[in-house]
A protein has these predicted regions:
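Hydrophobic transmembrane alpha-helices and their membrane-interface caps
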Residues: 106-173, 636-720, 725-742, 755, ...
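Signature of alpha-helical transmembrane segments and their immediate interfacial
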Residues: 193, 247, 262-311, 718
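Transmembrane helices with small-residue packing motifs
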Residues: 140, 211-222, 293-329, 739-745
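Extracytoplasmic/periplasmic membrane-proximal domains and adjacent transmembrane bundles
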Residues: 1-103, 169, 444-630, 634, ...
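Solvent-exposed, membrane-proximal periplasmic/extracellular interface segments of envelope transport
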Residues: 1, 333-419, 474-495, 511
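Helix-loop junctions and hydrophobic alpha-helical segments within the transmembrane domains
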Residues: 83, 90, 94, 169, ...
């Protein structure tokens, strides 16, 4: 009311009040855009958690405040509903992972009960909760938060934490069967296997860290806590195996269970099958080695068939829909299409809610889905559904039908994604807009012939109709109309302008508050203005008189770009496209890149590939550098332990034996090979290294005891097969719940470990003994027996294995020094 009584002075000196010449009313400005939820106008409240807080607790606090607000403050005619809830998404994910973790524990215990004698299974099973709970406590003390990354690490490492315990239990049973007392067998089993276990565990832990040094940006943030979590769990499991398990062995396993004549268990069947297979391999050594090489090469040929994507799609029970109309379209046109599409969505039974942003865009509600710079020709819908599966089903059903349903408009159906860039993006740089536009048009024409692509467009949009006003310098100066005053007057008469603010009183939580309300000046006559009316617009002169615009300026229509994009200071036009659902970028990208390389670009124009290809090109060297550093690190560990270049190189090359199973598994499951799958492969590398060390250490010790290379290799295979089978089985079944859960983020990791582990088990145990035999067939023993006073010191025990303390201490010490 006070604004209506403000006094104004006219050019002739008369005084009037605002309400004499204008109407003043309070209203929401809906001329540029507004929001609706389930067909009703609404306002949006968006909350974002401060860094360093617990998002689940944050969500609980918000729920408490909202419930209190509903009871005490919410008017009866106002409804409040939630569109997105990140705390709920995170809380559900954490709960699911905790469930999968417990299921994995149960599965591993059941597998051990099936494969082990009951007392041995009891001892090994105690390792799982003991190591997990101690590791979780250490993680808490170190400030490592519990989230889906750390929980996924716990599931991945769950089967591996029993590996060392299985090795110690197996050694204990062997020595116990050889006639030792329980205490002697417990001590001897730790002495025998501690250094190989320590070396293998340190190797596995170490290979995860180099990639942290090479990766950067969002990729590094996503995996930052993976290596320390793995390391803590494995090192704790090593301590448990070396300190706790021997005591449990003495207390629980009092004697070796005698075999019942005629009764055979699973490990007996596995051992018999393996003995026959290994004997055949030793009869055909070169065929075995050649066959393994052919198998690895063949799976390498299959590698390009994998679906590759840096980050997978998000598992969300919602999706977004974006509506694009030609530049210059009015809000009413956008509203009409939005209402029609909203009606279509609301008829779907699996849709639980639709929120429409007409002329505007939503706040950020997903980490990699940035708000769109909106206009009157844009609308966005957030569609909530019953489940993740319902979202995918609706996208598959509606996207092909309604993407181009409305003439002149494109409807983009957006599945939530972790990839922050367009899949297909190609840029042209140059100083001349017409030249870069010509290059972009050539590429778009080619891309529109590719059936897998849709919505091929540029970020310059389409040329829009403009009204160009050219001020006559002579006539305007005679009347005292400057360029600035003409611009201001035209802006006031053709649009609106904020000329100030007023403050209104209100209350929050029972306390008085004031809040700012913008004061906007606009001419209602301009709402229906046409092009012919622009000439008749009046401008005030320096003398106070008003003249029509046509008297001091020329008015002409023309087409022009509403925006000119610059990138790194250069004019740039980007051609982007969407891939149809179910398509992947690699083959299409290569075709487009080849076409760009053959394009006759205008003078002064250069091309650049962006989008997913650019992201992959940025991250791939970092990933390869990290893996390379890990391999070098492993090589030096092995070199200092075995003191032979040949055996260290064989171990590095043998890492490839895990690839056939992993690649075939991903192909059969039809899953994406992405950044998270990398940790599945690194885990597989660690499993292979552990088994290599156990096999080659045993073979070295047998040769040191006087066996030939062939006898030592054959005995190493036979003796280490069952422990390797048991450790691989527990690791593989540990990730089964992760596979069954079907998460797009973690299922490929589980498949890589499961399928790769099975393939690795078959190849490592059948090929490496043969390779070892051929490597040392004509050469000297890799570790000559240690002699005291010229007499060979024989080891006491069933395996007749001798340890060289000096060799053990020096090799490991130098290895640890290099690692530090």
């Amino acid at each position: 009311e006070s604004s209506e009584r403000v006094l104004l002075t006219s050019t002739d000196g008369k005084t009037v009040r605002v309400h004499d010449i204008a109407s003043v009313q309070g209203e929401y400005d809906l001329s540029d855009g507004y929001i609706e939820s389930n067909g009703k106008r609404c306002v949006i409240l968006s909350l974002e958690m401060l860094k360093g807080n617990n998002i689940v607790m944050f969500g609980e606090d918000v729920d408490e405040i909202l419930d209190q607000f509903r009871q005490d403050c919410l008017p009866e005619d106002v409804q409040m509903r939630r569109i997105t809830d990140q705390p709920e998404v995170v809380g559900t994910s954490v709960s699911d992972f905790l469930r999968d973790l417990l299921i994995s524990m149960v599965i591993i215990v059941v597998v051990m009960i099936v494969l082990f004698p009951i007392r041995s299974a009891m001892v090994a099973a105690l390792t799982i909760p003991l190591s997990t709970f101690v590791s979780t406590g250490i993680m808490y003390a170190m400030g490592i938060e519990l989230n889906i990354i750390t929980l996924a690490c716990l599931i991945v490492v769950l089967g591996m934490i029993v590996d060392n315990s299985i090795v110690v239990i197996d050694g204990y049973l062997e020595y116990l069967a050889g006639g030792m007392s329980r205490m002697e067998a417990a001590i001897k089993s730790v002495q025998q296997y501690f250094w190989p276990m320590l070396l293998a565990t340190v190797c596995i832990c170490a290979i995860f860290f180099p990639i942290l040094l090479t990766l950067k940006g969002e990729a590094a943030d996503a995996i930052r806590i993976f290596p320390p979590t793995i390391t803590i769990n494995l090192m704790v499991s090593l301590v448990v195996a070396a300190v706790i398990i021997p005591l449990l062995n003495v207390a629980i396993i009092r004697k070796v269970k005698e075999k019942v004549p005629g009764k055979r268990d699973i490990t007996d069947w596995v051992q018999d099958w393996y003995d026959r297979t290994l004997a055949w391999n030793f009869r055909h050594p070169w065929l075995t080695i050649a066959g393994s090489i052919v198998l690895v090469v063949a799976t390498g040929v299959l590698f390009p068939l994998l679906k590759m994507r840096q980050f997978p799609y998000a598992d969300r029970n919602q999706f977004a829909v974006e509506i694009y109309l030609p530049e210059g379209s009015g809000l009413e046109e956008t509203k009409k299409i939005t209402y029609e599409l909203t009606g279509i969505l609301e008829k779907e039974e699996k849709v639980t809610g639709v929120t429409s942003f007409i002329g505007c865009s939503s706040p950020r509600f997903h980490m990699s889905y940035a708000p769109v710079i909106a206009g009157k020709n844009f609308a966005q819908l957030i569609v909530n559904t019953e489940s993740i599966e319902a979202s995918l089903e609706l996208l598959d059903k509606l996207a092909p039908v309604y993407s181009n349903h409305w003439p002149g408009a494109y409807v983009r159906w957006k599945q939530m994604d972790y990839l922050p860039v367009p899949t297909y993006e190609y840029r042209f740089y140059g100083n001349n807009i017409d030249s870069i536009q010509k290059a972009a048009d050539m590429l778009m024409q080619e891309m529109r012939t590719i059936p897998e692509l849709e919505w091929v467009h540029t970020d310059y949009d389409r040329p829009s109709p403009l009204v160009e006003v050219s001020l006559d310098p002579v006539a305007s100066s005679q009347l005292g109309i400057s360029r600035t005053s003409a611009e201001l007057q035209l802006m006031l008469q053709t649009g609106k302008m904020q000329i100030g603010s007023i403050w209104e009183a209100g209350s929050v939580d029972g306390k008085s508050r004031t809040y700012e309300v913008p004061l906007v000046l606009k001419d209602r006559a301009t709402e229906q203005m046409t092009f012919s009316d622009v000439d008749d617009t009046y401008l005030s002169t320096a003398t106070g008189a008003s003249v029509p615009l046509r008297q001091v300026a020329g008015v002409a229509p023309r087409w022009g770009h509403t925006k000119i994009v610059h990138r790194n200071g250069e004019r740039c036009i980007s051609v982007t496209a969407e891939g149809k659902r179910g398509t992947f970028a690699l083959d299409i990208q290569n075709r487009i890149i080849d076409y760009i390389g053959q394009m006759p670009l205008p003078r002064g124009v250069r091309a650049e590939v962006g989008g997913e290809t650019e992201e992959n090109n940025d991250i791939t060297p970092d990933v390869m550098a990290g893996l390379g550093m890990a391999v070098v690190l492993i090589f030096f560990f092995l070199l200092f332990n075995f003191r032979k270049f040949s055996i260290a190189i064989i171990c590095i090359v043998a890492i490839s034996l895990g690839m056939p199973g992993a690649i075939v598994g991903l192909l059969i499951a039809n899953k994406i090979l992405g950044l998270t799958s990398l940790f599945g492969f690194i885990t597989l590398m660690g499993m292979i290294m552990r088994n290599e060390i156990l096999i080659f250490e045993h073979a070295n010790e047998k040769m040191a005891a006087g066996m030939s290379a062939k006898e030592a290799a054959f005995d190493a295979g036979k003796r280490r097969m069952v422990p390797i089978f048991l450790t691989t089985a527990t690791t593989a079944v540990g990730v089964v719940p992760m596979i069954i859960a079907g998460s797009s983020f973690w299922m490929p990791v589980g498949i890589t470990i499961f399928a790769g582990g099975v393939g690795m088990l078959l190849l490592v145990t059948t090929v490496l003994p043969v390779v070892y035999w051929k490597l040392y067939e004509k050469g000297p023993s890799p570790n000559p027996p240690y002699r005291e006073g010229g007499v060979t010191t024989d080891n006491v025990g069933p395996s007749a294995v001798h340890h060289t303390p000096l060799h053990r201490g020096r090799g490991l010490g130098v290895g640890l020094f290099f690692f530090c």
